[in-house]
Amino acid sequence: MWAGTWPTFHATILRSLLRVVLEHPRMARGRLFASYLSRSRHITSSVGSIGAAAAVAKILGLSVTEIAHAIGIAATQVVGLREMFGSHTKSFHPGRAAQCGLLAAFMAEGGYTSSDRALEAKRGWANVVGATKPDVQQNLEKWLGLEDNTVGLARDGAGRWEILRNSFKPFPCGIVVHPVIDACVRLHQDLATIGLVPSNIKTVVAKVHPLVLELTGKKEPQTGLEAKFSVYHGAACGLLFGKVTPAEFGNGVVKDTRVISLRDRIDAVISEKLAADQATVLLYLDNGQVLERHIDHAIGSIEVPMDDASLEKKFVGQCTPVLADGVKRASDACWAVENFQDISSITALL
């Protein structure tokens, strides 16, 4: 659809696109409501279509009324059950959310209408999606500046940009597992330093935030998709291989007897004292030693971001199977995206 709409994607459109990439997280503001949504819903689906609609509406240059209708059309399509985590359908959620947002904006552009109070009305998004959390409505009003007629957190001039709260993920699995994986990768190195190997591990205790087991508590994953939601698998791979890349979530690795053996020796224990981005991992070794690593902020977090070299390594590692010798050219082009006059110069490399 993009290729058909803009055969030549010029710099003016590219600048608009980059702007909405920066702005639409403010419009969607999923993080504000995450703790208030029903525990059975996937936040990416529940909020993503609204953010996508706002972003596309911005690119299309829709009027205020049309944007309101686009948001309404998107809001009525929200979907996503957390029961789907560990299956292909989990990845369907963000794709469907983006599709719904795109469709909503084009429908609004064509004159299709919706309620202009789709978010805040009594039977609107906030009160339906957050039906069991009465504070959702209040937080929405605060975010939009409706509560006391002040400049809301999402308004221009508020000085808050959600893009600055995003970061790049080093590990291809649930973000709540990252502190544990970070600790285990470091412990893998600690073992090597003292001349020991993972087979010297008797038991492992991972102290984690309650959300870790709620979201990633699959003790015996059977597939790579299920393993992405298993703190046990992530920890085992970090300890065994000293890295956790897409390869470690292959079905073969999930069935690897070494991985299963170590996974079975890992005990994840909830600690109310830990924040969601913290973890403590203890290794009890066969010689009586105990190694410990505590993570306050995992690699890839806002506080400890991936550096450019790590990002380059991740890009090359994941894209080489597809782009082969062209991966370096594509990487260089992505780093210099703001200098391109025509986005097709980049897409031609992909």
Model-assigned labels for residue ranges:
Residues 2-5, 59, 183-186, 190:
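Active-site catalytic microenvironments for nucleophilic, acid-base chemistry
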Residues 86-100, 106-350:
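Terminal-appendage/accessory-domain detector
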Residues 4-104, 110, 115-124:
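Glycine-rich, mobile lid/loop segments that gate access to catalytic sites or pores
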Residues 1, 45-48, 172-176:
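Conserved phosphate/anionic-ligand binding catalytic regions in large, soluble enzymes, centered on
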